[in-house]
Amino acid sequence: MKYSDLKYLAVDLPEAVMKEKWSGNFTGARKAIRRLLMSEGISYPLRCRLELELNNLDYIESRYTLSEEEALFVMQKRIPSMTAQELEELRIEDKADWMYIDGKVKFIDCFDATLYKVYPELWSATENGDESDYSLIQSVVDNAVLRMGESGQSKMTAHIHIRHDFNLKNEAVEKGKRLHVHMPLPLEKGSVKNLKIIKISPDCTSLPQKEDIQPTVYFDIEAGDGQVFSAEYEFDNELDYIDLSKANLEEIARTDVPEEEKKYLQEEFPHIRFTPHLTELAKELTGGETNPLLIVRRFYDFITTKTDYRFVRDYCSIDNIPEYCALNRRGDCGVQALLFITLCRIAGIPAVWQSGLDAKPGDVGEHDWARFYVPSIGWVYADLSYGGSSYIRGAFDRWNFFFGNVDPYRVPINDGFQKELAPAKIHMRIDPYDNQCGEAEYDDRGLTGAEVEYRYTEIDIR
């Protein structure tokens, strides 16, 4: 199966598999898949879909591991008075992600991680209340607006110096075999200025090229004990603040989208799909509006006010990510970004994925956001998860800021979703869609997320 065959996730599963899967009988689902794969007359797209589903089942089963009793124990660490009935209400309301596994309710291992960020009734029930700290971001917003008012121009800058380490767990090391490792690495383009690659260890086989959409440093090496792959770099992230509320709507309306940007209007299976539901949703939200900027603002408002920010299972185990977000009205940063991108493209507005790291002093981790094209203005940003967190806290200046802007405390690496690495991997990627943590494989098999470790070390962020 080729990397491009991921598009066949758009193929529906046979009913025999679906019945077993959603009843929680994963053993039965695997048996049904293997029986179908051995039968004659299976088309290539369906064969790929069934093979992908075997992988999906493994991911789902590995994540939905907490029993009801274990989940209640987790909740009681923050809310000691939490009862089993209250947990059940969270499950019924679909605020606590769960699934049937072998006939039993199992919660996803991260079900509680975002509850206290999203639902005021839960964070107010904890001893410390809302522990989210947005003071740095608020200062960025305040200063950007102030400088714009004083001079008409406002630049936002952060200096970021980090090290990314990646290694195989001991039990995954097969000494003497050829090991292939990809690690994400930013390129000097866009907002990334003065990039310095300080150290790559061990010696790499190749560095990313400027045309790479998901750039990586690549190692082709003999596997051995104690190997740690490391990339240390620093750069300045420089962004210009823009206040889209003051944009010239008439000029936007009379300016056409350039031909070179129209490639960002296309579907990209299996996820960026113009399904009947999403097409009608875009039409409903548009409501007859014709100005591109006002249309996009309606999409932004819908996602940031009507969908909940929630950690989700691995993307490779979700068949259609934007549809998942719209139907369930929840998703993490990338899920929300993909719904936004898809709605924009349906409406004829170019939009594209961007991802990398959220890099604030004391906190470095993966993050995804979106960019969209405004005629007569150009490419601007939308961060749906930061926008939603601002809205729920009544910080409407921050909410408006993240429509058109992102803060500079991030490492932009990837300029597209579901793009091939260079050189191409042989086997299924740990993350087939994004490139933030690292990938590894031997010639004869791919390595899973459970077989590797990675970490980001802050050296200097200011």
Regions found by a protein language model. Give the residues of each.
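Repeat-mediated protein-protein interaction surfaces in helical alpha-solenoids
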Residues: 1-3, 31
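Hydrophobic/aromatic-rich core segments of domains that either
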Residues: 3-6, 10-23, 59, 74, ...
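Acidic low-complexity segments
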Residues: 14, 21-24, 211, 225-323, ...
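Intrinsically disordered, low-complexity N-terminal segments that are enriched in acidic
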Residues: 22, 30-242
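Terminal peptide-recognition signature
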Residues: 181, 299, 370
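Active-site nucleophilic cysteine motif
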Residues: 292-299, 329-344
